[in-house]
Amino acid sequence: MTSAASGSGPVELTDPVPVKPRMRGWLHAGMFPAVVIAGITLIVLADSTRARIACAVYVLSACLLFGVSGVYHRGTWGPRGEAVLRRLDHANIFLIIAGTYTPLTLLLLPESTSQPLMWAIWGAAAAGIAFRVFWVGAPRWLYTPCYIAMGWAAVFFLPDFMRTGGIAVLVLVVVGGLLYSVGGVIYGLKRPNPSPRWFGFHEVFHSLTLAAFIVHYVGISLVAYQQ
């Protein structure tokens, strides 16, 4: 805040409040009902009880991601509401990573491997959620790499994914991961920022998360339907 003198005395000048691009939040808000419908379809058509439970975890994490993001980014909130929703929005990124790993790990890996990996992934997600909840003001350069690193934590199991799920599943998992990663880099750098008034860097990031979810959804569907 600065002050300036005029003929009538000092005038307080406040710093301008950043204006959200007009498309902020619409992509995720619009995606939410589609995720609900697609998620129910995935759960119902899954070939086994194990697959249905694993897919339900994945679908729930996706609904939270897109639903909370849509509410947070479309609304105008006071300081307290802003802080709560921002914490939930950022924490849900760790949740969707673990949720995506759940059907892939439980349905493509043997029990001896899937159980330790599930503990590791969900333990990392719990730590990440606590990190974002209790340190919501952490710098982007710190927490963004955490998202990306956790997303690729099971890279050494990709050959196992291919052996059990096939080359199509492997390609879809990798492509989805790359889309999420590119989105994370754009979010961290705030570049490119094509149209700050309409469609900024955050909308590019949301577009890539949406595309990544669709790619992973197709891959997980292939896995769930062949159990």
Describe these PLM feature segments.
Residues 1-227:
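Multi-pass alpha-helical transmembrane bundles in non-GPCR membrane proteins
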